[in-house]
């Protein structure tokens, strides 16, 4: 039972990861995944917010923080099988607000979800 008496119980880690890696490259992600595999740790991914479903946290896990993966690239005339036209390549740490700003600069439309307090899925 939760109380306001600090001597009434133990302080625990709770449902949070015990390790975290703030990645800024693909090689950092590869190293983190290998560490989690070798240490038999649950792996969770955290981008720019949190998930109400708990996907961005987990007791005893290794959390990979992708917030610094900010690559954002615009392709005005992408040509691939089945599609021809403008496109964007968006890194895992780019916020929807940043995507919208880039789309506005490039005079294109971008569709995404946004929630001012957390990642909304």
Segments and roles (model prediction):
Residues 1-121:
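N-terminal accessory segments
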């Amino acid at each position: 039972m939760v109380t306001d008496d600090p001597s009434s119980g133990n302080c625990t880690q709770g449902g949070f990861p015990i390790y975290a890696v703030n990645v800024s490259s693909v090689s950092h992600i590869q190293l983190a995944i290998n560490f989690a595999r070798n240490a038999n740790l649950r792996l969770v991914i955290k981008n720019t917010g949190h998930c109400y479903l708990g996907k961005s946290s987990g007791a005893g896990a290794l959390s990979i923080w992708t917030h610094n993966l900010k690559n954002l690239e615009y392709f005005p005339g992408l040509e691939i099988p089945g599609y021809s036209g403008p496109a964007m390549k968006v890194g895992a740490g780019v916020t929807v607000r940043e995507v919208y700003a880039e789309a506005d600069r490039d005079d294109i439309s971008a569709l995404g979800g946004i929630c001012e307090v957390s990642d909304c899925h």
